[in-house]
């Protein structure tokens, strides 16, 4: 679930996407939201006047500021299941199984840490830093989505 430009947007199984202006009355947006996908959408975030969804098999899709008209993005080589996404410092960062994917303001997708032995389950952004967490109590931080530092874990 994400909120941006006065809209709530939720995502889920089989590519389901729902949009609401008030948090109760929902509708299905056009584009990806209006059809069934063979992908589970695990996470969604808002940034740079866009919503980004992430899901199974490295699935990524982006929308305009109104939450309508989702468009599939090219899945980077090596990207696996993605579970969470965050926006900060003019980039989107998505994390998942052995995968960190960066979608920057120029629209380029670059897989980062795709060979990492850890599976990241969640990512957030605050105070100028991305923080990704995963199995075995690992925590990594990054300011640019490219260079990651392990700050905790086994």
List PLM regions with ranges:
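Residue-level hotspots at or immediately adjacent to binding/recognition sites across diverse folds
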Residues: 1-154
């Amino acid at each position: 679930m994400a909120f941006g430009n006065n809209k709530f947007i939720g995502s889920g199984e089989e590519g389901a996407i729902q949009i609401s202006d008030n948090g109760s009355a929902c509708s299905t947006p056009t584009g990806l939201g209006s059809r069934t996908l063979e992908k589970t959408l695990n996470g969604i975030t808002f940034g740079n006047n866009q919503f980004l969804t992430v899901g199974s098999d490295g699935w990524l899709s982006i929308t305009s500021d109104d939450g309508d008209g989702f468009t599939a993005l090219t899945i980077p080589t090596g990207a696996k299941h993605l579970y969470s996404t965050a926006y900060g410092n003019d980039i989107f960062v998505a994390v998942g199984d052995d995968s960190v994917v960066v979608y920057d303001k120029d629209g380029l997708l670059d897989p980062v840490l795709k060979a990492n032995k850890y599976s990241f389950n969640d990512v957030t952004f605050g105070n100028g830093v991305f923080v990704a967490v995963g199995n075995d109590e690992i925590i990594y931080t990054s300011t640019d989505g490219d260079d990651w530092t392990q700050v905790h874990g086994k």
